[in-house]
Design a protein with these regions (language model features):
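NAD(P)H-binding glycine-rich loop region in Rossmannoid oxidoreductase-like domains
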Residues: 1-25
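Structural signature of the Rossmann-like NAD(P)-dependent dehydrogenase/reductase core
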Residues: 6, 43-48, 52, 91-97, ...
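Conserved catalytic-site region of short-chain dehydrogenase/reductase
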Residues: 13-14, 46-60, 72-78, 98-102
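NAD(P)-dependent short-chain dehydrogenase/reductase
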Residues: 82-133, 138-147, 178
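Conserved Rossmann-fold NAD(P)-dependent oxidoreductase catalytic core, especially the SDR/UDP-sugar
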Residues: 6, 32-70
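Short-chain dehydrogenase/reductase
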Residues: 22-24, 59, 65, 70-78, ...
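C-terminal substrate-binding subdomain of Rossmann-fold SDR/epimerase-dehydratase oxidoreductases
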Residues: 121-122, 126-203
């Protein structure tokens, strides 16, 4: 094949914490194996996560900032990124939280999860609502990959954050945006529970 986009992965904080060995095998080792057998004329575009930025309180992060992943998921993906950059001429995208329609909808993604709960339960309990996340629609992700395939040798061996600048929003703001499209819903803001996923950053 001409272009490799390795999408197979164990994704997200809960799933990777549940089976760290499997997460490492799929998210890191399989990427290393792919890179090791690449031919010189094959292109690789790697979808990393911006979870590698961890929790930041000192302004906006850029591609030049050090990665400090705080979850096993983030660590496995960042280790794979390092290998691609050091051992190949690939291109890496650090993706914001992706949302959008799918034939196999992932409700563990924050935006999709909130939409699903507000549609089905008509209410949601929200904790640590001030945490900031960044989002991007799946169609924008697809367009970015298409662009880089066509311009591969201009940008190869580089890393790019991929998200929407105006979608650096708090969890509370996200819920309010969704509520503007779904009527007769309510939100319970709770200080009792904590979010085990401590990501909090602006990209």
């Amino acid at each position: 094949c001409d272009v490799i986009i390795p999408l197979a992965a164990l994704v997200g904080f809960p799933l990777c914490e549940k089976d760290k060995e499997l997460a490492t095998s799929i998210n890191t080792t399989q990427i290393q194996n792919i890179v090791n057998v690449l031919s010189d004329d094959q292109k690789i575009l790697y979808p990393n996560t911006n979870s590698g930025y961890g929790s930041r309180v000192d302004g906006m992060v850029t591609e030049e900032d050090e990665l400090t992943p705080i979850s096993h998921y983030g660590k496995t993906k960042c280790e794979a990124e390092d290998y691609i950059i050091n051992e190949s001429n690939g291109i890496v995208f650090r993706l914001a939280t992706v949302f959008g329609g799918s034939s196999r909808m992932r409700t563990d993604l924050l935006a999709n999860d909130f939409v699903y709960k507000l549609l089905t339960d008509r209410y949601i309990t929200l904790f640590e609502h001030k945490f900031v996340r960044n989002f991007i629609h799946i169609q924008d992700v697809s367009r970015a990959f298409e662009f880089m395939i066509d311009n591969y040798y201009t940008f190869n061996n580089e890393v790019f954050n991929l998200g929407l600048s105006d979608e650096n929003i708090t969890k509370k703001q996200l819920v309010e945006k969704i509520q503007s499209h779904i009527s007769d819903t309510s939100v319970n803001y709770s200080d009792y529970y904590v979010d085990p996923d401590k990501r909090d950053y602006i990209v």
